Amino acid sequence: MSFTDLGLPEWLNESLSNMAITKPSAIQKACIPQIMKGKDCIGGARTGSGKTIAFAAPMLAEWSKDPCGIFGLVLTPTRELAIQIAEQFTALGANMNIRVALIYGGVDMVKQSLELQKMPHFVIATPGRLADHIRSSGEDTIRGFRRVRYVVMDEADRLLTPGFVPDLKTCMDLLPDPSKRQTLLFTATVTDAVRALKDRTGEKGPPFIHEIASDIAVPSTLTQSYLFLPGYVREAYLWAILTHPDNEKKSAIIFVNRTQTAETLRRMLMALDVKTASLHSEMRQQERVNALGRFRAQAARVLVATDVASRGLDIPTVEMVINFDLPADADDYIHRVGRTARAGRKGQSVSLVTERDVTRVTNIEERVGTKMEKYDLIEDDKVVEEYLTPASTAKRQAVLDMEAENFGERKRIQRKKAGLDVDMKSKNKKPKRVAKGKSDKK
């Protein structure tokens, strides 16, 4: 089956061909015809299976018949994913003079407001920043959203979590009634919150649902491995894995749970002559864009990232994912390892497991449906003799440099302004007593 068979116009087939996309994936075969028939859609598929094309292609096909106003809105949880989706829309619509607006935090709101007033054809946004515009930027900025034909929630399982819901509701309340627009939800993990939406049928009847079987949560081309080790030697083993002859030319993403760890590992690996970039919330937006650009261009072989990079980012060259820290949620593990073994390619994941992680490993294996294999490429004696001291020295210097630079100060200031300050210096101080009868407002 070809994209022509799915009913896409010739100009769009040419754009797909120029992007080296010639055969539709399972989710594209299932969803594109149904969306073009006007149905709402819930699309669940493994990461790397082409979900973005599954909603972008039919939207663009319909837009080309009447290219005016803000035709479609795509909501997504992270800036990086928003940028990637916008790039795909721009590439697909390059021959049709498409106008795509990117709306996310960390850049000037006035500039974004002016861009929205020009009525771009498609808006790719994070809910928080779009909600800010709805609340404060005025009617000229937001009026185009009152007539959108499509709204997409990409990584819908994440958008429907409590942290996003208030801003998401603000965005959705501005849009036309569901009976007057198409609503498309796409995700790699179809949660109960996503699945519950199928019962809200309304006038249009039930949505079309394409859902993967739960027993194939990760690609069959992915090899999942683990290394059981003491926590204090993880850095040495990480360096040993990355520089092993079998891996020294592979591109890799290292996932961690904290921004502090991400920056520490980046500096440590750079000191050990491993070209490394990092991606975490402590970085300014342009720094994040530059880091991703370096990694995509292979100027950096390794990317150290928090879960900001675990969802949706399509970097085809990633051959290995290393979980330096295991995530608490098994679905987050699925999203992480899904950065490799994409679109039928082979890939490998290695999880560094300490004694505290055993329960997490068990939960992950139950969710994924397969056991991790022991990673036996690294010799313990060699790590102790050759890697432990240099890695420890490089890590110690990285920590000292970060302390001297007040790393994390910007975030602490932001949290303080938001009333969420956690003063690291006062963590060990006893709380002040409050006089009887006085309130203790935070």
Swiss-Prot record:
Motif (DEAD box): 154-157
UniProt xrefs under Gene3D superfamilies: P-loop containing nucleotide triphosphate hydrolases (3.40.50.300)
Region (Disordered): 411-442
Subcellular location per the Swiss-Prot or TrEMBL entry: Nucleus, Nucleolus
Keywords, ordered alphabetically: ATP-binding, Helicase, Hydrolase, Nucleotide-binding, Nucleus, Ribosome biogenesis, RNA-binding, rRNA processing
InterPro entries: DEAD/DEAH_box_helicase_dom, DEAD_box_RNA_helicase, Helicase_ATP-bd, Helicase_C-like, P-loop_NTPase, RNA-helicase_DEAD-box_CS, RNA_helicase_DEAD_Q_motif
SMART domains: DEXDc (SM00487), HELICc (SM00490)
One GO term (biological process): rRNA processing
EC number: 3.6.4.13
Annotated ranges, domain Helicase ATP-binding: 32-208
Cellular compartments per GO CC: nucleolus; nucleus
One term of GO molecular function: RNA binding
Biased composition (Basic residues): 427-442
Top-level lineage group: Eukaryota
Ranges where the Helicase C-terminal domain occurs: 237-383
Catalytic activity: ATP + H2O = ADP + phosphate + H(+)
Record motif Q motif, residues: 1-29
Residues the record lists as binding ATP: A45, R46, T47, G48, S49, G50, K51, T52
Stated role: ATP-binding RNA helicase involved in 40S ribosomal subunit biogenesis and is required for the normal formation of 18S rRNAs through pre-rRNA processing at A0, A1 and A2 sites. Required for vegetative growth.
Entry's family note: Belongs to the DEAD box helicase family. DDX49/DBP8 subfamily.
Domain notes: The Q motif is unique to and characteristic of the DEAD box family of RNA helicases and controls ATP binding and hydrolysis.
PANTHER family named in the record: ATP-DEPENDENT RNA HELICASE (PTHR47959:SF24), ATP-DEPENDENT RNA HELICASE RHLE-RELATED (PTHR47959)
Protein name: ATP-dependent RNA helicase DBP8
